[in-house]
């Protein structure tokens, strides 16, 4: 264990070192492993815990991909998976390039965004991290990179069934730079304004959850509704994918929240406990509410949505509240997000994956309730917030102003996120070849066929025999008819089920 103690200057989970950057093990340069064993400055148990939590967070990205793909129609499944995985790659590059430095460089003192001191991960090898003096900065940087990647995976689901992939990749890089990194700096950088004000946000209620929710809302507004959204009731094509995605998300979330204690300690254990309780209760409340007041059915989709909402709400408060409070937070969140989806339907907002209703609303609720339920003894479980350094807590600890701080923080994050994201999307859509939305014909045949040319599901009985259909000048398959035994194109766009398939054109009409 390092002999240097961390002293919190605010009540976030990020701790600031008592030593200046030049007094770190490497003298602020990152260190030279050829001259000295830099591992000796750090506790192996704490470092191992964060290294283990990093791949746990990574598995959340395919979890999001499966969750979204199951909610979509079959002809748009693969595009949603590709958006999540391509977004993961763009996030890694951006985070390495300058994202980490803009969010966490401690020499940038504006309070709103960092500088380029750690451009391309320079000077990050073995310095004390902004998260804790117990782990090296390189470990911290990689762990935090997972948070950026997960946020992008959540946000990109807003393009479901009508968004183009290419423009989204460019938007991802820009959005991380001008939206995510500044918000992360506000709350997790020791120089950030929200950090200094004493806002409680344990693992990303603002940057990750509210950030992805309001960004998705802006994307939904810019894209507009899907064609036939009003006339048709779209149904998820694979409930099994939704359950699989939920399972991967829940599994990864334990590392996401547990690792945010930045050490192998009791606070990490409490964060995992609270995460499980909030997710479980929210899932139960959601499905029971639907059964009693709406459908009289035990909805699998409803259960999975409730679980995810509870996990989202636990993100900002898992390291600040007691298990009893987590039960209440899970129940409140399950009801609020359930009502939010119903309200979205009445307003005819086509947020196909319910990103705002689940992540935006649950992130808002969880972060706000931190100001009510946060208690000093939970934060003290990491061994840092003890004695004179203990937090003041929330209303239960008679710290009345904390709710106001939490509300101001959420409103600032939501407003900044929505406005800047909308501006990015609006400008991008006006650039030639970077239009956000696919053509109406492409939307009809499916984003998988238009943007990828591959299919998530391709059955033997639905063989694609190209001699029975042709590409129109618009670049989409034309429907054919049989006249006197001869196949003739009609000039109409083939419906998804008629792009098929059999060697006998008379069998056209099967559905995908």
Curated annotation (Swiss-Prot):
<keyword id="KW-0924">Ammonia transport</keyword>
<feature type="topological domain" description="Extracellular">
    <location>
        <begin position="376"/>
        <end position="406"/>
    </location>
</feature>
<feature type="topological domain" description="Cytoplasmic">
    <location>
        <begin position="69"/>
        <end position="77"/>
    </location>
</feature>
<protein>
    <recommendedName>
        <fullName>Ammonium transporter 2</fullName>
    </recommendedName>
</protein>
<dbReference type="InterPro" id="IPR029020">
    <property type="entry name" value="Ammonium/urea_transptr"/>
</dbReference>
<feature type="transmembrane region" description="Helical">
    <location>
        <begin position="239"/>
        <end position="259"/>
    </location>
</feature>
<keyword id="KW-1133">Transmembrane helix</keyword>
<feature type="topological domain" description="Extracellular">
    <location>
        <begin position="1"/>
        <end position="47"/>
    </location>
</feature>
<dbReference type="InterPro" id="IPR001905">
    <property type="entry name" value="Ammonium_transpt"/>
</dbReference>
<dbReference type="GO" id="GO:0015200">
    <property type="term" value="F:methylammonium transmembrane transporter activity"/>
</dbReference>
<feature type="transmembrane region" description="Helical">
    <location>
        <begin position="168"/>
        <end position="188"/>
    </location>
</feature>
<dbReference type="GO" id="GO:0072488">
    <property type="term" value="P:ammonium transmembrane transport"/>
</dbReference>
<dbReference type="GO" id="GO:0072489">
    <property type="term" value="P:methylammonium transmembrane transport"/>
</dbReference>
<feature type="topological domain" description="Extracellular">
    <location>
        <begin position="189"/>
        <end position="201"/>
    </location>
</feature>
<feature type="transmembrane region" description="Helical">
    <location>
        <begin position="48"/>
        <end position="68"/>
    </location>
</feature>
<feature type="topological domain" description="Cytoplasmic">
    <location>
        <begin position="428"/>
        <end position="512"/>
    </location>
</feature>
<dbReference type="Pfam" id="PF00909">
    <property type="entry name" value="Ammonium_transp"/>
</dbReference>
<dbReference type="GO" id="GO:0005886">
    <property type="term" value="C:plasma membrane"/>
</dbReference>
<feature type="transmembrane region" description="Helical">
    <location>
        <begin position="202"/>
        <end position="222"/>
    </location>
</feature>
<feature type="transmembrane region" description="Helical">
    <location>
        <begin position="78"/>
        <end position="98"/>
    </location>
</feature>
<feature type="transmembrane region" description="Helical">
    <location>
        <begin position="355"/>
        <end position="375"/>
    </location>
</feature>
<keyword id="KW-0472">Membrane</keyword>
<feature type="transmembrane region" description="Helical">
    <location>
        <begin position="301"/>
        <end position="321"/>
    </location>
</feature>
<keyword id="KW-0813">Transport</keyword>
<keyword id="KW-0812">Transmembrane</keyword>
<dbReference type="InterPro" id="IPR024041">
    <property type="entry name" value="NH4_transpt_AmtB-like_dom"/>
</dbReference>
<feature type="topological domain" description="Cytoplasmic">
    <location>
        <begin position="223"/>
        <end position="238"/>
    </location>
</feature>
<feature type="topological domain" description="Cytoplasmic">
    <location>
        <begin position="344"/>
        <end position="354"/>
    </location>
</feature>
<feature type="topological domain" description="Extracellular">
    <location>
        <position position="322"/>
    </location>
</feature>
<feature type="transmembrane region" description="Helical">
    <location>
        <begin position="268"/>
        <end position="288"/>
    </location>
</feature>
<feature type="transmembrane region" description="Helical">
    <location>
        <begin position="138"/>
        <end position="158"/>
    </location>
</feature>
<dbReference type="GO" id="GO:0008519">
    <property type="term" value="F:ammonium channel activity"/>
</dbReference>
<comment type="similarity">
    <text>Belongs to the ammonia transporter channel (TC 1.A.11.2) family.</text>
</comment>
<feature type="topological domain" description="Cytoplasmic">
    <location>
        <begin position="289"/>
        <end position="300"/>
    </location>
</feature>
<feature type="topological domain" description="Extracellular">
    <location>
        <begin position="260"/>
        <end position="267"/>
    </location>
</feature>
<feature type="topological domain" description="Cytoplasmic">
    <location>
        <begin position="159"/>
        <end position="167"/>
    </location>
</feature>
<feature type="transmembrane region" description="Helical">
    <location>
        <begin position="323"/>
        <end position="343"/>
    </location>
</feature>
<feature type="transmembrane region" description="Helical">
    <location>
        <begin position="407"/>
        <end position="427"/>
    </location>
</feature>
<feature type="topological domain" description="Extracellular">
    <location>
        <begin position="99"/>
        <end position="137"/>
    </location>
</feature>
<comment type="function">
    <text>Transporter for ammonium to use as a nitrogen source.</text>
</comment>
């Amino acid at each position: 264990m390092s002999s240097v103690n961390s002293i919190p200057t605010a009540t976030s989970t990020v701790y600031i070192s008592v030593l200046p950057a030049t007094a770190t093990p490497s003298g602020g340069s990152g260190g030279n492993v050829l001259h000295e064993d830099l591992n000796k400055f750090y506790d192996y148990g704490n470092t191992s815990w964060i290294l283990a939590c990093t791949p746990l967070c990574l598995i959340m990205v395919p979890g999001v991909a499966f969750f979204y793909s199951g909610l979509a129609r079959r002809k748009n499944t693969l595009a949603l998976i590709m958006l999540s995985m391509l977004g993961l790659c763009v996030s890694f590059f951006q985070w390495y390039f300058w994202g980490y430095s803009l969010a966490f460089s401690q020499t940038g003192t504006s309070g709103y965004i960092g500088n380029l001191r750690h451009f391309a991960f320079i000077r990050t090898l073995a310095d004390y991290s902004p998260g804790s003096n117990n782990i090296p900065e390189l470990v911290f940087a990689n762990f935090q990179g997972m948070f950026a990647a997960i946020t992008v995976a959540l946000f990109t689901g807003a393009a479901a069934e009508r968004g183009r992939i290419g423009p989204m990749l460019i938007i991802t890089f820009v959005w991380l730079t001008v939206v995510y990194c500044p918000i992360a700096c506000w709350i997790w950088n020791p120089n950030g304004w929200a950090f200094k004000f004493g806002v409680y946000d344990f693992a990303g209620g603002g940057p990750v959850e509210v950030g992805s929710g309001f960004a998705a809302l802006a994307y939904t507004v810019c894209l507009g509704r899907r064609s036939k959204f009003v006339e048709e009731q779209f149904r998820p094509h694979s409930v099994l994918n939704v359950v699989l995605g939920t399972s991967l998300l829940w599994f990864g979330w334990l590392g996401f929240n547990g690792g945010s204690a930045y050490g192998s300690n009791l606070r990490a254990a409490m964060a995992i406990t609270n995460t499980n309780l909030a997710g479980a209760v929210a899932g139960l409340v959601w499905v029971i509410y639907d059964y009693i007041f709406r459908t009289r059915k035990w909805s699998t989709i409803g259960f999975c949505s409730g679980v995810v909402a509870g996990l989202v709400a636990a993100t900002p408060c898992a390291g600040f509240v007691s298990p009893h409070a987590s039960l209440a937070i899970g129940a409140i969140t399950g009801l609020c997000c359930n009502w939010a989806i119903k309200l979205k339907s009445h307003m005819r907002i086509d947020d196909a994956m319910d990103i705002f209703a689940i992540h935006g609303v649950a992130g808002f609720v969880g972060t706000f309730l931190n100001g009510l339920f946060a208690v000093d003894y939970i934060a003290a479980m990491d061994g840092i917030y003890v004695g004179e350094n203990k937090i003041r807590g929330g209303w239960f600890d008679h710290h009345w102003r904390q709710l106001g701080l939490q509300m101001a923080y959420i409103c600032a994050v939501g407003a900044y996120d929505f406005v800047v994201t909308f501006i990015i999307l609006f400008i991008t859509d006006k650039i030639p070849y970077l239009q956000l939305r696919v053509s109406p014909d492409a939307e009809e045949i499916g984003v998988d066929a238009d943007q990828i040319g591959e299919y998530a599901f391709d059955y033997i009985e639905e063989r694609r025999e190209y001699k029975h259909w042709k590409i129109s000048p618009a670049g989409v398959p034309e429907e054919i008819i049989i006249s006197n035994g001869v196949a003739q194109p009609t000039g109409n766009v083939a419906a998804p089920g008629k792009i098929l398939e059999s060697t006998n054109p008379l069998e056209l009409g099967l559905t995908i």
